Design a protein with these regions (language model features):
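Short, Lys/Arg-rich nucleic-acid/phosphate-binding segment
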Residues: 64-70
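Conserved strand-loop elements at the edges of beta-sheets that form or border functional pockets
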Residues: 16, 62-64
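N-terminal leader segment of winged-helix/HTH proteins
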Residues: 1-17
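C-terminal regulatory/oligomerization modules of transcriptional regulators
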Residues: 1-6, 25-39, 44, 53-61, ...
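Pre-recognition alpha-helix immediately N-terminal to the DNA-recognition helix
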Residues: 20-22
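Short alpha-helical segment immediately N-terminal to, or the first helix within
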Residues: 13, 24-25
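Short E/K-rich amphipathic alpha-helical oligomerization segments
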Residues: 71-75
Length: 113
């Protein structure tokens, strides 16, 4: 069954390049919106819109500090994506292992005839 694409979906949220850039920006640590705007060279309303989506799926958390709103990455909420991607990583590794085995066999036999 196909997944529905909603903004409450981690997969949909990280499907947007600007949102991935925001996540990349937050890897270094907590930042106010203005710093993210400077990092990405997007408008403040655009960044705020993307931060809202990322917050809705739990990838980003915010807290108030004085007049600033600081945002931080919630890495644990990337786990569903990591788990999904791990299946494909395992499949690719198994295929690469078979290629390695075949190449070793060819080398042992003296190469292709």
């Amino acid at each position: 069954m196909a997944r529905s694409a909603t903004t409450a979906d981690v997969f949909n949220a990280i499907g947007d390049a600007n949102r991935r850039d925001i996540l990349d920006s937050l890897i270094a640590g907590e930042k106010p919106v203005g710093a993210i705007v400077s990092d990405l060279r997007l408008s403040q309303p655009q960044v705020s819109k993307h931060l809202r989506v990322l917050s809705e799926v739990g990838l980003v958390r915010s807290r108030a500090e004085g007049r600033l709103r600081l945002y931080r990455l919630e890495v644990a909420h990337l786990q569903p994506f990591h788990d999904w991607l791990a299946k494909y990583e395992q499949a690719m590794n198994a295929r690469l292992d078979r290629v390695d085995d075949y190449l070793r066999k060819l080398q042992h036999e003296g190469g292709p005839q």
